[in-house]
């Protein structure tokens, strides 16, 4: 089983639907890979074209098949608004190693709501880095 670190570079978004009618929205992203979830900073007052340029690290195995990035609008005093989400397949990253910042569609209720730019890098974890010997992985260990 391939195991390692997925590095996600959240660059920015463009053309997002503004959920605040009186002023620019304050977008942030929630990144989820299987059970791990991380949150970006809030791009205060950046409206429909926020930039983050933030990096997030996830511990993954090859059975983590997708990264979901949910975009939200931070609202004080009321619940945050859901702007849309992008689902990114991770299958290519395990063979390619890295994917430069690429544009993905942001969707809400099956409709296009803008785009998000994300870069991905996968670094496999060497079994020796985890302190395991060949005998510890799927085999019998000779007792003395």
UniProtKB/Swiss-Prot annotation:
Keywords: Calcium, Cytoplasm, Metal-binding, Phosphoprotein, Plant defense
Biological processes, Gene Ontology terms: defense response
Disordered, as annotated region: 123-144
Stretch forming the signal peptide: none
Residue span(s) of domain C2: 1-103
Disulphide bonds in the chain: none
List of residues binding Ca(2+) 1: 20, 26, 73, 75
One Gene Ontology CC term in the entry: cytoplasm
Presence of the UniProt keyword Phosphoprotein in the record: yes
PTM section of the record: Phosphorylated at Ser-40 by CPK18 in a calcium-dependent manner.
Tissue: Expressed in phloem.
Record's note on what induces expression: By fungal elicitor and calcium.
MF (Gene Ontology): metal ion binding
SUPFAM superfamilies assigned to the protein according to its UniProt record, in alphabetical order: C2 domain (Calcium/lipid-binding domain, CaLB) (SSF49562)
Cofactor requirement: Ca(2+)
Protein's UniProt keywords contain Nucleotidyltransferase: no
Primary residence: cytoplasm
Localisation: Cytoplasm
Residues with Phosphoserine modification: 40
Residues involved in Ca(2+) 2 binding: 20, 73, 75, 81
Function as written in the Swiss-Prot or TrEMBL entry: May play a role in plant defense signaling. Does not bind to phospholipids in a Ca(2+)-dependent manner in vitro.
Name used for this protein in its record: Elicitor-responsive protein 3
Annotated source species: Oryza sativa subsp. japonica (Rice)
């Amino acid at each position: 089983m391939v195991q390692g670190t997925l590095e996600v570079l959240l660059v920015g978004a463009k053309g997002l639907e503004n959920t605040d009618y009186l002023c620019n929205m304050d977008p942030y992203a929630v990144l989820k890979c299987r059970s791990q979830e991380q949150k970006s900073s809030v791009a205060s007052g950046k409206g429909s074209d926020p930039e983050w340029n933030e990096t997030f690290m996830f511990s993954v195995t090859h059975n983590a098949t997708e990264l979901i990035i949910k975009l939200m609008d931070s609202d004080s005093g009321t619940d945050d608004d859901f702007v849309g989400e992008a689902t990114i397949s991770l299958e290519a990253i395990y063979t390619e190693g890295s994917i430069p910042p690429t544009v993905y569609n942001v969707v809400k209720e099956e409709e296009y709501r803008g785009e998000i730019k994300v870069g991905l890098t996968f670094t496999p974890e060497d079994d020796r880095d985890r302190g395991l010997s060949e005998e510890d992985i799927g085999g019998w260990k000779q007792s003395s």
